Design a protein with these regions (language model features):
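Beta-strand-rich N-terminal accessory domains
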Residues: 20, 26, 78, 378-523, ...
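Short strand-turn-strand beta-turns centered on an Asx-Gly dipeptide
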Residues: 178, 186-190, 194, 306, ...
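Short, well-structured beta-strand segments within conserved domains
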Residues: 86-88, 159-165, 216, 230, ...
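Extracellular/secretory pathway-exposed regions associated with glycan biology
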Residues: 234-302, 306-394
């Protein structure tokens, strides 16, 4: 069997951390300032059509910067941090500019970069350049790191960023021995940076020197910006250690652990790091590893293992992972309360399946430190990884595949769309259309598709979006009543029948189907300027009392220009040609419903 999961095997397990939400009821998290540009609000709205325009509503829950000529201070946290994970939602006003500094020294740029084709270091999510001045005050910039993709959404929409940061390291004499590092930065679900070292502070730091800790700093002198759901995981604790590692190796096709545990081992020894490579064979062997975990403080710890074959783990006098069979790519996880001090650990594994490559890994983590690995790099080399099979869209591209809709971070799939049509464009705006119900299921910006799940090895027929994904609603959009907002209309009642699609000269498809006796043509195009989608629904033999569900979301707000902010400011919808909609609310969900005669046209911007 081909081994496809090396990269997944080398990844850290999912982190469980003591994540703390920054209070948004007052400014107590931040140092006091005489300037009044920073304030707490209940909500904010940025006018899509006005430069640097943002308004705040009285209340709590949102941190907002509204600078003017006299009040434009940066915001600095009262506490200092070293290794840290930070996540937050943020909103940019049109053409606004800000920056989030880790340790007050290393800036991640926040900017209205909506529609930028090729992002630079100065665009949203970029790591800003270093800066110095010559004797004649000439500015010199160097380094700087552009994001891998432009994942920036339109101004006035809530966006999300996750940052994992490692502080610089210093020896006892205060000499720097390791650079600061952005371990990972993602924005709107898209990877922007990974393992980027910073040789020194970026432009505009709180101080030019480097230190082991420092405060958060947010620029306040450039333009309006808002934050909510700011959460911090502080990794300031001493990490666990593993010492006194010994091993026993037994050769044979053992069916149970009792078949070898009382035997004399064929090989024994000591190790600095765990590795399965103490075995001379890649199959029909058993291994027992023993060591001492040095636990820095009493508390809850997560222990993760990765072993091929039957395996078990004992910590102290407790079996935390009973014997079970694991594939090469499987991780096993246990959460356990441990006392401070030395705690024995024992790992047993035996393997008789020749089709699996051997593998061995051990990680330990706590809320106070990131996962620490105690195995050699080569011990996780489960084979040569296959290159990803990526599909770009240098011209309008139509690609049929299965598409998993609404996949959770744990891999749970709400629905597999089996008659999905994925349409890509050189403007880097793409969408998935469900031919089983006429729904525009999802849209995304960035790169087009990862087709590895479809074409690698046996494949499962599916592909994955590669950009910043926005889920819409995979449900039949037509209903016979404005109150019929609950999505899934029975096909027997609607008499839905797909009629395929036609390709225009530019390569874009027009989808055709029949529903409620009406013949429908559905054309989705890229808007002028490549910043959104335009959708035109044309009907023949239109049924009476036919309504179209344009959008679904938790909250909807109609703006002064008649457009709508959908699903708590995730995207914009604008009805065209005088169409009038109504917002219907059922429980926590709202639906934008429009009566349809012969034609409906609307645009989506995000």
């Amino acid at each position: 069997m081909r081994n496809k999961l090396l990269l997944a095997s080398l990844c850290f397990p999912i982190w469980l951390t003591a994540q703390v939400a920054v209070p948004m009821k007052d400014m107590s998290f931040w140092k006091t300032s005489s300037a009044t540009n920073w304030q707490i609000a209940s909500d904010v709205t940025a006018d899509f059509n006005k430069r640097n325009d943002m308004t705040a509503s009285v209340g709590t829950g949102v941190l907002v910067n509204l600078p003017n000529e006299k009040n434009r201070d940066n915001l600095v946290s009262a506490a200092e941090y070293g290794d840290v994970d930070v996540s937050f939602d943020f909103m940019m006003a049109r053409h606004s500019n800000s920056g989030f500094y880790l340790m007050g020294r290393y800036e991640v740029q926040l900017l209205d970069s909506w529609g930028v084709k090729n992002a630079k270091y100065s665009d949203c999510g970029g790591i800003y350049k270093r800066r110095r001045y010559t004797a004649d005050s000439t500015e010199i910039l160097w380094e700087g790191h552009a994001p891998l993709q432009n994942a920036c959404l339109a101004p006035g929409l809530w966006q999300h960023m996750d940052i994992s940061f490692q502080a610089p390291r210093f020896d006892a004499a205060g000499k720097k021995i390791a650079n600061a590092k952005y371990i990972k930065i993602t924005m709107n679900g898209i990877l922007l940076h990974e393992n980027v070292e910073l040789t020194g502070p970026t432009g505009g730091p709180i101080e030019e020197n480097e230190a082991a800790t420092g405060p958060f700093m947010i620029q306040g002198d450039h333009g309006p910006v808002a934050f909510r759901n700011l959460k911090v995981s502080n990794f300031n604790g001493k990490a666990a250690e593993l010492s006194d590692i010994s091993f026993n190796v037994y050769y044979g096709a053992f069916k149970e652990a009792k078949d070898f545990l009382n035997n004399k081992p064929d090989s024994t020894g000591k190790l600095e790091k765990l590795t399965w490579e103490v075995s001379k064979e890649i199959n029909d062997f058993a291994q027992v590893f023993k060591g001492t975990l040095k636990i820095p403080q009493a508390g809850k710890y997560k222990i993760t293992t990765q072993m091929a074959g039957k395996n078990a783990v004992k910590v102290g006098d407790k079996v935390i992972l009973p014997e079970n069979f694991s594939h090469t790519s499987n991780k096993r996880i246990a959460s356990v309360d441990l006392p401070a001090g030395d705690v024995p650990i024992e790992m047993t594994v035996y393997k008789t399946d020749g089709w699996m490559q051997p593998i061995l890994g051990l990680w330990v983590e706590s809320p106070n430190f990131r996962p620490v690995s105690f195995h050699s790099f080569s011990s996780l080399m489960a084979g040569t990884p296959n290159d990803p099979i990526l599909l770009d869209a240098p011209q309008p591209t139509v690609f049929r595949s299965f598409m998993d809709f609404n996949v959770s971070q744990w891999g749970k799939v709400e629905k597999r769309i089996v008659h999905a049509v994925n349409v890509g464009s050189p403007d880097k705006l793409h969408f998935t259309y469900d031919m089983d119900n006429g729904a525009l299921a999802q849209i995304w910006k960035g790169d087009f598709l990862n087709t590895s799940p479809m074409w690698d090895d046996r494949g499962d027929g599916s592909s994955r979006p590669r950009g910043a994904l926005l889920l819409l609603n995979d449900a039949p959009p037509f209903t016979k009543s404005v109150k019929d907002t609950l999505a899934y209309t029975p096909q027997s009642e609607a008499q839905f029948r797909t009629l395929g699609y036609d390709l225009a000269e530019n390569g874009m498809p027009t989808f055709r189907y029949r529903i409620y006796g009406s013949e429908v043509e559905d054309l989705v195009e890229i808007t002028e300027g490549g910043k959104g989608l335009s959708r035109t629904i044309s009907l023949k033999n239109t049924a009476n009392d036919l309504f179209y569900r344009v959008a679904t979301g938790k909250k909807m707000l109609q703006l002064a220009d008649g457009s709508y902010l959908i699903d708590d400011k995730k995207y914009y919808v604008k009805l065209m040609n005088g169409a009038k909609g109504t917002v219907e609310t059922v429980g926590d969900n709202s639906f934008l419903m429009v009566p349809v005669k012969d034609k409906l046209q609307y645009s989506i911007m995000w």
